[in-house]
Design a protein with these regions (language model features):
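Conserved acyl-donor/pantetheine-binding loop and adjacent beta-alpha core of acyl/acetyltransferases
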Residues: 75-104, 110, 268
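Short, P/G- and charge-enriched loop/turn segments at secondary-structure junctions
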Residues: 49-50, 85-92, 158-159, 233-235, ...
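Active-site rim helix/loop that mediates acceptor-substrate recognition in acyltransferases
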Residues: 41-65, 221-241
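A short, well-structured alpha-helix characteristic of acyl/acetyltransferase catalytic modules
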Residues: 1-8, 16-39, 43-44, 50-53, ...
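Alpha-helical elements of Rossmann-like donor-binding domains used by nucleotide-donor carbohydrate transfer enzymes
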Residues: 22-25, 51, 117, 121, ...
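Conserved beta-strand in the GNAT
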Residues: 63, 69-78, 99, 104, ...
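Hydrophobic adenine-recognition pocket in adenosine-nucleotide-binding enzymes
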Residues: 15, 103-105, 138, 276
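Acyl-donor (CoA/ACP) binding surface of acyl/acetyltransferases
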Residues: 116, 124-133, 141-144, 160-161, ...
Length: 358
């Protein structure tokens, strides 16, 4: 049987009040299947009709429709699960996470990959919110869900305890952000996440003598934990308010970082900073990456002003805003203390939204 043809006319969307009756039929089918298979995860009390109704009202209920018929249901939540705080085990980090609960597939669509497809759509919903932790739990006797979790690359993290002393296995996985091209063949850019801390730290640590000349923060970065703390401080901020840190990559190799800093959303202004490893310089990477972020900031994020600050002696860094049409507004005298103990003047450049329309 060709599953591709069967699922080609599917629509994934938020559940609506009009879907409730059909969803409840699917929940009943799922309960009956669990009973046949000897799983005790769901019973006559859970999930209740009122729970499904609340999912829909809060916007956490999602469905797959085949034509006009709902064939899969699940709840995608970002509100946290209280029992996860007392896990007998350990989560990778304490950043915001996404959970899928109450996943059920209509009998006529079973064995067609619908549950897996729902989970992958949930990952996309999470990416759009800038949340990259995915947590789930399931009963020890729910072999179907355990197989699904394993096929999606989740890692076991411990046990959680629900009502009635119901102990479940807990799992988590990292959802990696999508990568984007930015005008240089073979290179990509994406948001840096907690799991990148190790490779970022290693890259900085191996190039300390070079990077510390113009990047005073390097001397304060002493461990992977320091980098994890830095990334966490960004990732815990809601996506629409976040100063995103991006990795420039060639394949799976890090080339450098670029990102927004000190954004003032009330006045629609932000700042861009960047650094590149020595072996990737001179290829136009930073110029193209800064151009990419400028378009993102001015055309999509609602900023009106972008600022770049460069030490006067850092010729390569100054060349970036100059090349991209930034205006030099002036120089901050003794604007930064370098690692040699000397102050350096800082050139200040700006680009306004109206500048790119001229």
């Amino acid at each position: 049987m060709d599953n591709k043809n069967i699922t080609s006319n599917l629509q994934f969307r938020k559940a609506e009040e009009a879907d409730l009756e059909r969803i409840w039929v699917i929940i009943g089918q799922a309960k009956a299947q669990m009973q046949r298979l000897g799983s005790h995860q769901w019973d006559e009390h859970y999930p209740a009709l009122e729970t499904i109704r609340q999912d829909i009202e809060t916007g956490s209920g999602y469905v797959f429709c085949k034509g006009n018929t709902v064939v899969t249901y699940g709840a995608i939540s970002f509100d946290g699960e209280p029992v996860y705080k007392d896990i007998d085990g350990k989560w990778t980090n304490e950043l915001p996470y996404m959970i899928v609960h109450r996943l059920a597939v209509a009998d006529e669509m079973k064995r067609q990959g619908m549950a897996k497809r729902f989970m992958l759509e949930a990952e996309e919903v999470s990416r759009q919110k800038g949340i990259y932790n995915f947590r789930v739990d399931t009963n020890y006797d729910n072999e179907y869900m355990l197989h699904l979790i394993d096929s999606l690359g989740f890692q076991y993290t411990g046990e959680v305890r629900y009502r009635g002393n119901n102990i479940r296995k807990a799992f988590e996985k990292c959802i990696y952000p999508h990568v984007s091209s930015f005008g240089v063949p073979g290179y990509t850019i994406r948001e840096a996440i907690y799991e990148d801390a190790g490779i970022i730290f290693d890259a900085i640590d191996k190039n300390r003598d070079d990077l510390r000349t113009w990047l005073p923060f390097v001397d304060g970065l002493k461990s992977v934990g320091d980098e994890q703390a830095f990334l966490s401080s960004s990732l815990q901020v809601p996506y629409e308010e976040r100063d995103i840190v991006y990795m420039i990559e060639k394949g799976k190799s890090i080339c450098g970082l670029i990102g927004f800093h000190f954004s003032d959303r009330a006045n629609h202004r932000t700042e861009i900073g960047y650094w590149l490893l020595p072996e990737y310089r001179g290829k136009g990477l930073v110029t193209r990456a800064v151009h990419h972020l400028c378009l993102l900031a001015l055309c999509e994020k609602g900023f009106n002003r972008i600022q770049i600050r460069c030490a006067i002696g850092n010729t390569a860094s100054n060349a970036i805003p100059q090349r991209l049409g930034f205006k030099q507004e002036g120089t901050e005298r003794d604007g930064e203390l370098l690692i040699n103990g000397e102050y350096t003047d800082i050139n200040v450049y700006s680009l306004l939204k109206k500048d790119i329309a001229e």
